[in-house]
């Protein structure tokens, strides 16, 4: 109540911002006559004038009105397009580091030129981030005349470019590119062996197009650069054969396993919300029996024996592949290869692979070639990458529903920009049916009715499978249609260009040509661009034909958007609706749902459908009721809330890794910048040797407790020196713990200096630097794997009444500290034993190391919630802490590691103990 009174008195935050922006727009408009009077040369000279004023101490905000007015006039002269006032308001929001929500067709691309130009005047570079290569190239080409007229350079950053081309693209004042490529370039820059190989400048200012898609939808899938692991296994194929024999256990929500009646019991349960599968007690027994039968386990062994624990990785990967990932929904199979379909856009993602063995399990399921498993070399989430920029902003047509998350995670405020013309699209209420068959019958009838009156339709589906199902229904009804999904995305531009023609029926997955407008009557520009050397008479004839089509479509009601199911996010539904009603055009939208749709089946209570049946609702009866609409919206809010919690949780864990990543990358950068690290090496040697001595000569201990033979042996093996420490102690009674430390360190340093004196100093410095880089890269790679293992199992700490997030922070810090100690010790020891090398041998070694690096693969990880907190909380209440009982003998340091790597325990997971 009080909030409403305050809003009425002072207006909403959005209204107050718009009011402030409108005053600045008035100042920009007032400058228009003055700027219009300038010659081309004088207009171009404004850029140098602005740069000089910046050097003289003026701020960007002081330059803003005049700079924006200059860009508007340049746009008129080069493109024939004049920025609307609402586009300028959008530009002001972007310059202020906010998200501008601008409706589809309102000209976001042109609106971004003003803040891009203004911020590029600093000379630090501006990145304009798009969701795909096509849009990056198109927007750069389209807006380039404005920037180049004003003396600024434009670069395009897309996959497949040579490093020299990328360096040129990043050196440009304004760089267009995809979110993936910007992120991968950042990771690659932190894997180079020479500063000249880096391509990015310090990250200054980014404008993210379709910001909701990049910062929300893709926030759960971190970017990963990986190389092939040393070995792979045919276990995926063998275990794949077992899975179809397993039976799903039928359970009601909240029911415990022991409460399930015998006839409903099975081998596994599914958590579709979190996309996880779990074996039941019966399932463990079934799998064990099948494993023993196939000779993968010995009779009497358990899946959880130390020797078999790695098998669970393959079992769970195969179980998820069979029960939660479907062909033509989550992936397609093309040329004997499994290609992921982006669930948010419907586009194919060639080259991307799911992690944790899931991709190999899907390949085994489909009979495709199983590619080798990968090992992560570098990784970062979009949350942490984009937070590296000094200033960040974004634009989209749909961000308001996610405003809280964008503010909380990124500190980005959403400003809803008014439309240039009033929006007159009619959003009709949902049509809900009991069954999917009844829903599709109603859809066909609706399409037929609108198609016959010449109204174009865009039918939105959630998956390739659903789009092909709708296509079959329409084909059966003899309704001509086009289908746009990941399988035929090559024809996307042509299909979208014709989707606004009278009576056109276009079926599209979520991709729906996002970033391109559906023009009523068809896209005249696209039509003309396909034809060369047209006579003026022919051009006028085609324009007249288009006008007739355009008028006919408007008379029929404009574009009608028909959704075949609700997405789990209201924002995606709004994106689909937004294809219609652009720039004041007429249009309409409506969703057709059934109680068998995934959203309602998983998230809306089952009792709703039971109640409808009890009330006598028939299959083909349509249900329209505010209560149903509220239930659907509530289900969507639940999913949005759950997905936000997952993203927040993943960010909380990734922030830990991010702090460590910054330390490693900073050390690496400093290494590359420095030619002589001999002082650093000396400090590292002193610290590493001192710590090693302390393990044999404990601090503040009696001499009887010292292990001198062990210390001599360790120094001999690791540093290649035979130091008679026992004799020193016999001859010199004044030696104590502190002086012994100093004498050993001095002897090891003296031996190194003697070796150094015989070598070429330049070669020695290069050896030190190269070796440190190699050790840093190797141990960071191993550390990423250890962190991943830790993250996957950390939720189990909840059963011991411990906070998993706190435990993860504590243990990951310990792992990181141990890693740094190992790097220092190995560096000191290896340098001590290293043979003298010439400068040419060092260069040859560097070349060999770089050539031996695995072929890199670029992909997104498939990350899910670690475990719902509610489940852990329940487990905390139900399970009392049990005393630890070792089921297997303790693994010796020189025995094979039980993880199956083939290494000794002390060289594998024993390192982490």
Swiss-Prot record:
Citing just one GO molecular function, the answer is:
ATP binding
The cofactors it requires, by name, are: Zn(2+)
Task: Report the EC code(s) recorded for this entry.
Answer: 7.4.2.8
Q: How is the cofactor bound?
A: May bind 1 zinc ion per subunit.
Keyword tags: ATP-binding, Cell inner membrane, Cell membrane, Cytoplasm, Membrane, Metal-binding, Nucleotide-binding, Protein transport, Translocase, Translocation, Transport, Zinc
Q: Name one GO biological process term.
A: protein import
Among SUPFAM superfamilies, the record links this protein to: Helical scaffold and wing domains of SecA, P-loop containing nucleoside triphosphate hydrolases, Pre-protein crosslinking domain of SecA
The listed locations are: Cell inner membrane; Cytoplasm
Top enzyme class, one word, equals: translocase
Locate the region Disordered. 568-588, 871-913
UniProt xrefs under InterPro entries: Helicase_ATP-bd (IPR014001), Helicase_C-like (IPR001650), P-loop_NTPase (IPR027417), SEC_C_motif (IPR004027), SecA (IPR000185), SecA_CS (IPR020937), SecA_DEAD (IPR011115), SecA_motor_DEAD (IPR014018)
What membrane topology does this protein have? Answer: Peripheral membrane protein
Biased region (Basic residues) positions are: 903-913
Spell out the reaction equation it catalyses. Answer: ATP + H2O + cellular proteinSide 1 = ADP + phosphate + cellular proteinSide 2
Q: Which GO terms describe its cellular component?
A: cell envelope Sec protein transport complex; cytoplasm; plasma membrane
Q: Which Gene3D superfamilies match?
A: Helical scaffold and wing domains of SecA, P-loop containing nucleotide triphosphate hydrolases, SecA, preprotein cross-linking domain
Residue numbers binding Zn(2+):
897, 899, 908-909
Subunit and partners: Monomer and homodimer. Part of the essential Sec protein translocation apparatus which comprises SecA, SecYEG and auxiliary proteins SecDF-YajC and YidC.
Into which family does the record put it? Belongs to the SecA family.
Role summary? Part of the Sec protein translocase complex. Interacts with the SecYEG preprotein conducting channel. Has a central role in coupling the hydrolysis of ATP to the transfer of proteins into and across the cell membrane, serving both as a receptor for the preprotein-SecB complex and as an ATP-driven molecular motor driving the stepwise translocation of polypeptide chains across the membrane.
This protein is called what?
Protein translocase subunit SecA
Write down the species: Coxiella burnetii (strain RSA 493 / Nine Mile phase I)
């Amino acid at each position: 109540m009080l909030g409403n009174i305050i809003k009425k008195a002072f207006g909403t935050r959005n209204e107050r911002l718009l009011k402030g922006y409108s005053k600045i727009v008035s100042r920009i408009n007032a400058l228009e006559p003055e700027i219009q009077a300038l010659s081309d040369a004088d207009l171009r000279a404004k850029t140098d004038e602005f740069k000089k004023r910046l050097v003289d101490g003026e701020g960007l905000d002081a330059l803003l009105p005049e700079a924006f007015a200059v860009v508007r006039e340049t746009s008129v002269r080069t493109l024939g397009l004049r920025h609307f006032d609402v586009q300028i308001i959008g530009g002001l929001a972007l310059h202020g580091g906010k998200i501008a929500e601008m409706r589809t067709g309102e000209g976001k691309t042109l609106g971004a030129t003003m803040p891009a130009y203004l911020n590029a005047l600093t000379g630090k570079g501006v990145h304009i981030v798009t969701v795909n290569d096509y849009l990056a190239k198109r927007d750069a080409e389209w807006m380039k005349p404005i920037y180049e007229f004003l003396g600024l350079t434009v670069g395009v950053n897309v996959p497949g470019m040579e490093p020299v081309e990328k360096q040129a693209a990043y050196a440009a004042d304004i760089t267009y590119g995809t979110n993936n490529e910007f992120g991968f370039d950042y990771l690659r820059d932190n894997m180079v062996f020479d500063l000249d190989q880096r391509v990015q400048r310090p990250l200054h200012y980014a404008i993210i197009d379709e910001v909701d898609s990049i910062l929300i939808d893709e926030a759960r899938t971190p970017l990963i650069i990986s190389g092939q692991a040393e070995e792979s296994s045919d276990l995926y194929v063998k275990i794949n054969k077992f899975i179809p024999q397993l039976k799903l256990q039928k359970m009601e929500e909240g029911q415990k396993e022991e409460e399930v009646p015998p006839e409903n019991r099975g081998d596994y349960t599914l958590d579709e919300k979190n996309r996880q599968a779990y074996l039941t007690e019966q399932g463990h027994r079934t799998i064990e029996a099948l494993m023993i039968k196939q000779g993968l386990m010995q009779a009497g062994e358990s899946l959880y024996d130390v020797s078999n624990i790695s098998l669970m990785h393959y079992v769970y990967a195969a179980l998820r592949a069979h029960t939660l990932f479907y062909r033509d929904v989550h992936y397609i199979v093309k040329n004997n290869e499994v290609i992921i379909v982006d669930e948010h856009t419907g586009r194919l993602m060639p080259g991307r692979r799911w992690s944790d063995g899931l991709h190999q399990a899907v390949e085994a399921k489909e009979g495709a070639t199983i590619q080798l498993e990968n090992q992560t070399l570098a990784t970062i989430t979009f949350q942490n990458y984009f937070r590296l920029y000094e200033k960040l902003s974004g634009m989209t047509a749909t961000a308001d529903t996610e405003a809280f998350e964008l503010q909380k995670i990124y500190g980005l405020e959403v400003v809803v920009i008014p439309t240039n013309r009033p929006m007159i699209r009619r959003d009709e209420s949902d049509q809900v049916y009991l069954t999917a068959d009844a829903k599709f019958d109603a859809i066909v009838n609706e399409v037929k009715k609108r198609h016959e009156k010449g109204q174009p339709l865009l039918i939105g589906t959630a998956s390739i499978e659903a789009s092909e199902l709708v296509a079959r229904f329409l084909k059966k009804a003899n309704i001509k249609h086009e289908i746009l999904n990941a399988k035929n995305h090559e024809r996307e531009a042509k299909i979208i260009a014709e989707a606004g023609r009278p009576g056109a029926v276009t079926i599209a997955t979520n991709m729906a040509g996002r970033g391109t407008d559906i023009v009523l009557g068809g896209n005249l520009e696209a039509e003309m661009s396909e034809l060369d050397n047209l006579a003026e008479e022919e051009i006028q004839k085609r324009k007249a034909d288009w006008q007739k089509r355009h008028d006919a479509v408007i008379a029929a009601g404009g574009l009608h958007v028909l959704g075949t199911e609700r997405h789990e996010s209201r924002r995606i539904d709004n994106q689909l609706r937004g294809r219609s009603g652009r720039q004041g055009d007429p249009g309409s939208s409506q969703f057709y749902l059934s109680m068998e749709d995934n959203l309602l089946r998983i998230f809306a209570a089952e009792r709703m459908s039971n109640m409808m049946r009890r009330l006598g609702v028939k299959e083909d009866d349509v249900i329209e009721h505010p209560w149903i609409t509220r239930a659907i919206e509530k289900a969507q809010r639940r999913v949005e809330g759950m997905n936000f919690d997952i993203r927040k949780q993943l960010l909380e864990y990734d922030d830990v890794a991010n702090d460590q990543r910054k330390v490693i990358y900073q050390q690496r950068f400093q290494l590359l910048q420095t030619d002589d690290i001999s002082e650093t090496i000396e400090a590292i040697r002193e610290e590493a040797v001192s710590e090693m001595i302390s393990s044999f000569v404990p601090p503040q201990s009696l001499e009887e407790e010292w292990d001198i033979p062990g210390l001599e042996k360790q120094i001999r093996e690791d540093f290649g020196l035979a130091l008679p420490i026992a004799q020193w102690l016999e001859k010199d009674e004044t030696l104590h713990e502190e002086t012994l430390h100093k004498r050993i360190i001095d002897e090891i340093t003296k031996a190194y200096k003697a070796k150094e004196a015989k070598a070429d100093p330049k070669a020695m410095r290069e050896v030190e630097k190269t070796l440190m880089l190699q050790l840093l890269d190797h141990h960071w790679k191993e550390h990423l794997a250890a962190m991943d293992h830790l993250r996957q199992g950390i939720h189990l700490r909840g059963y011991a009444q411990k906070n998993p997030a706190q435990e993860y922070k504590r243990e990951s810090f310990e792992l990181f500290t141990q890693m740094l100690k190992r790097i220092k010790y190995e560096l000191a020891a290896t340098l001590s034993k290293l043979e003298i090398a010439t400068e040419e041998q060092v260069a040859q070694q560097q070349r060999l190391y770089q050539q031996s690096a695995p072929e890199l693969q670029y992909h997104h990880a498939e990350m899910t919630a670690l475990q719902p907190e509610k489940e852990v909380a329940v487990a905390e209440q139900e399970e009392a802490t049990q005393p630890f009982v070792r089921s297997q003998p303790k693994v010796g340091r020189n025995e094979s590691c039980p993880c199956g790597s083939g290494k000794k325990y002390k060289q594998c997971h024993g390192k982490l103990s």
